[in-house]
Amino acid sequence: MLILGGGIAGLTAALALAAKGHSVTVIEQGAHLGGRMWHAPPPVLLEAHGATWSLIKSLGQDAVTRPLRHTPLEFLQSTGARIQFLHLPLPSPLNTLLGTTLFQGLSMRDRWHLLSFLERTWEQDPPLPNDLDSRVADEWLTSIGQSETARHGVWNSLARLLLGAPLEDISAGLFMRTLRRCFLTGARATKLIVPPQGVDSFLLVPLTRELDRLGVRIKLNATVSQVRFSPNRVTEVEFADRTRLTADWYLSALPPQRLTPLLPERVVTHYAYFQQLSRLSESPLVVVRLHLDLPARQTQLILLEGKTFHWMIRHPDEERHDQTSVVWALAVGEPSLLPQSTEELVRLAMDDMAAAFPTAEPPRILDFDVMRLASAMLASKPGTHQYRPIATSPFTNFLVTGAWTDTGWPANLESAILSGQRGAEAISAQL
């Protein structure tokens, strides 16, 4: 079995297939595995992320997460007010009703309108509109009585965290489904865990170690130039150096803009499955990691309103020294930040950090990293859902996976892992 792409989706599929005794080779054009998750910040884990927790457990990383406490979700509003969303250990819907009632980030009027909407939703009177996937989230929130202050503050901050874009750029349907899954389905669902490690240390290292134990072959710095097809099957892949590989099954774990150029033009033009990939677009991401000479007692996640960066994570530096801490500053959907110099991005991150985590004296930076991704995640625009492909393609031995495929989730870590699992299951079901 040949897997194109060594990101999380491809590695998850490789793990599932190799665990069942199949011979698997992973092709990665980069110098390392992990794709966009290489050097990514700590994952924001909710109980609703079932596929992610399944992978964590299979890798033995639940030993890391088990002792971790709930990480409160904080909002730093443009007024300077700090609001915390309460995690209440109560059964659903009581936890949702009480949590919404007590949440100070929304005015009493906004809370009342939200509770009225939730009550109608639970009773399905009236049923939810059928066109939410094609509507803009900002317009939909207005229609259920959310004020401009609420939309530009709390809801916009959540939209950037969960879907990677502001309200005016995302699908109302996907936003509502994600909110419901993450925050409105019981006390366990709202428990939030942020491990004090980046994705590479927390997931990629143990995942790579397990793949090596299972005998999965990894080919790094290997650039595929073309996927070759017969009338109903993939027959081989050709590399830039003209060498070729064949397999019984092929699974793509590439982003759409890298997959399409590998396909013959006749395949792209003939099959709507591949043709519609051109309708998908991606959003940029900028991440600044600051290693500081200031200790942190616990992990914090704070959403920022009206700042350069949209949220920050601070956690103790458990990998190097307990008297230091690490701060991650993230900005999504802001292409204007990409050409900024490294020094300027670090300065902007320090400015936002001073507001998010005020101290008597500015901490000293021990070291830092800046990551710029022009195409980081699928843009969740209205109407995008209909163009996200399922795992099974028109060709019997060719599967397509990735966070951007149709998983029901935004293009996040959960979506990547779930798509990899589904791709592996689709292959196993036919063997």
Pin down the residues of each PLM region.
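Glycine-rich active-site loop/strand segments that organize a redox cofactor
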Residues: 33-48, 116-117, 121-125
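Mobile amphipathic helical/loop "lid" adjacent to a hydrophobic cofactor/ligand pocket
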Residues: 52-53, 57-172, 176
